[in-house]
Amino acid sequence: TALEKGIVDIGGGCYCFHPSEFPLHAFQIWTPFGTTSPLKSLNIARDVYGVTPELADVFEKKHNQKLISLLTLDPYEIDARKPIRTMADLQNFKIGGAGPNLPWVQNAGAIGVQTTATIAYNSLQTGVYDGVIGYVSLTVALKLHEMAKYHTKVGFGAMTWLYVHMAMDTWKKLPPDVQRIVEEVGRDFEEVLAQETQENYHTRLAQIAREGAEVIEISPELQKTWAESLKDWPNQRAKEVDKLGWPASKTAKLNLEVAERHGHKWPHRYVIE
């Protein structure tokens, strides 16, 4: 990448686009129905990173980069062309997703379709799929509610898996006092952004409602049943990543426990062996 080669000094992105290099960094994705608070999600992720050195060390040891900030999305939800109020509504319903999050709907009976944000609007318009996993800031930016008028608050959770990195060559040139400032500013930035994301969430929901979307919040009973339909997947996915040489099961367990310490109650408590 441009960062690894030192072409740019600092850059950002999503670990979701690097599943082979950074599979462990999707640990919150493996345990859906986590906190819907971006700020809590960030704090949970930082606690996990703090005791899992493999998460940050890989950037410096293998990719010539330094982690500066972790960034959090608003809660993952579904924009759909029909209401989703029961598990029956999901059966054979075609739903697009980025890939790592498709098991959230496939295990519940839907048909998962690999997609990207850039083609979501046209794919909904032409019927390639009838719903798409996303988040309300994306809904607003891409006007997805024009094609999928039912915005379903599933409660999949706010995920912390975006980043800001600095090229290590650039980092090493900085005096120690400047390095400390960069680290402090990086941590401040991620907290401010998470807080802003949290505050903007309801504003954006209100916006799409004004523009004709119906915002549906699924019942606690449906959320519990949906989470139970995924009960085996977190452990299966962790074991797959374990085999790649990462401490995935340990990290997934830790994520569950840390979320609980931050006050989260899982609708179904996943078991990681």
Regions found by a protein language model. Give the residues of each.
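N-terminal secretory/targeting leader peptides
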Residues: 1-43, 53-273
